[in-house]
Amino acid sequence: MDVQYVLADLQTGPESQSSQSSIHFHDMAPFYVVSIERQHGLSGLVSIVPCSTTPTIHYDEKDKKAYQKAWSRGRRFAALFENLLNGGKMATKTSCSLQQTPYLQLRDEALIVGSPLGTPTRTREGISSFHNMEFNFPGAKPVVSSQMLHITCPGLRSEESLFDKNGGALYDSVTVLTGMCLFTRKILDESVADGFLDTRKLLDMQLTLYEVERIAGLSSAIADIAALVLSRYDGKCHKPVNIILDLPTWHYYQSVEDQLQHRGYKPCEVMDWIEAITLRSQQLAGLLKSAVLHELDRRGVSSSQRLYDIQISPGSALVDDAFRETLKYENLPCLDNILEALSGSEDGSWQQFYSLLPERDRPQSIKDLSYLFYIFEVVRPAVLAGIQSGNQQTPTQSADMDSTVSHRQQQPASSRSYTSKQNQMPRPLVISVDDPSERKLYSKAHSFFLRLPKNPIYPADPTLVQVYTTRRVFVDGNRKGERLYRNDPSPVMPELSNGKLYGDGGDAGYSKYARELQQMDFIAKLYGAECAANIQRWSKEVGLC
């Protein structure tokens, strides 16, 4: 699923020139042509073009400083990420090439994306730069995968890598996690909009454009990062590498919670509706897992080697069971019952997480809990690391540790240490891979990470690296910064736009497709025909075709 620099523009407004939406494709590669709005029609999107040794930034004059700042900050964090995954400065591109070792190279090309000034999206998300990060996997069947990524890692120091100055593993465990939504916002709303819960709309729904695009984009990025981490540890040490796929189930209950009392939905109806959502979640999780396994195998990491573990929404099972148990007895779920069920988690992660929440951040409704739970899934690996280390502190040790932590956080990770191994806090590394629209969630998770070293019971010193994939699909020229999830026309497919099929860098064979775009045509255009064929095959295996 190597990234081709093809972007899509979904036209839902008057410019579509019909009641049906249409779609344009724009080839941004190989970046040697200045890509500015008058050429591709996407507001707020600019490119950085390699020009001798200094990249040239093509920007909107009104946003000159903002775009330059976004590029500079993004480039700096991308370089830190490159150093982290390459195992430090000792692992240069040249040495890795000579040894046939996988490596990451930060290239010059970049996309800077920002919605127009004055739009809610611009206020919420600002401007981000996505840098071309080239993952190289030599071998009998070499793979070179280019990802346009935005990195945020405020807790990462310039000298930090996977190893300390003595060559020992710096982190006790590595977790790569991601998540995605189900269906589209429109489909979920329509399933509850006609005075009854229309479960059939959910059960009979084909894959949406949003779903297939997320699976294609996330799986290759996850595999690139996980495979590179595994290659660094190979032969040196064995450290747990976990991949977590977090997909919602009960979280969507808040979509109907406010309407239950007004419309008189029966608990059995609600249960059927949630079961339909759970089925979709399981199917998509299976599809995403198959895609990740395939991409890891392409990069030389076979599942038979048992070097990693893939988990699906590991913290949600207790809540799913609590919902089923309540609805089975014709009752509606309530927050107190769910919190009580969570308090019985065997690994203790929820109890520790909840105990560190300030009173103002504790949920007051199931809707609050559903959002908080996404944050919990990000924080959970770090909380578990503290619990599993078994280094429970006495109150006196905790007080002494506060001053030690304050000093440690000013030091590079390579020099961080305690006077004795026994008192050393566990250091889990968590790498999230997600859409930029979820940035607020990970910012809240990061603020929680900062509290864990001072946890009076099970302290940990975690690092969170946030990796965001670039948007591949824009809506209405990005004039309002809207997202595909809220504007996906599925199950009605958009029309291919006239005059945009050829001469835009697309495949010559694309003319064989029908005028109405299908999901796999859409993926073939963005990610390649092989990727589309694989997703179609895996979809059948999980019952989605």
From Swiss-Prot:
It catalyses: L-glutamyl-tRNA(Glu) + L-arginyl-tRNA(Arg) = cyclo(L-arginyl-L-glutamyl) + tRNA(Glu) + tRNA(Arg) + 2 H(+). Residues 390-433 are annotated as: Disordered. Pathway: Secondary metabolite biosynthesis. A motif (Conserved DDXXE motif) lies at residues 434-438. One of its GO terms (molecular function) is ligase activity. Residues 390-425 have a biased composition (Polar residues). It is an enzyme of class 6 (ligase). Keywords: Ligase. It comes from the Eukaryota. Its EC number is 6.3.2.-. Arginine-containing cyclodipeptide synthase; part of the cluster that mediates the biosynthesis of a highly modified cyclo-arginine-glutamate dipeptide (cRE). Within the pathway, ateA acts as the scaffold-generating enzyme and is responsible for formation of the cyclo-Arg-Glu diketopiperazine (cRW) from L-arginyl-tRNA(Arg) + L-glutamyl-tRNA(Glu). Additional enzymes from the cluster then further modify the cyclo-Arg-Glu diketopiperazine (cRW) scaffold. Belongs to the arginine-containing cyclodipeptide synthase family. The conserved DDXXE motif is essential for catalytic activity. This is Arginine-containing cyclodipeptide synthase ateA. It comes from Aspergillus terreus.
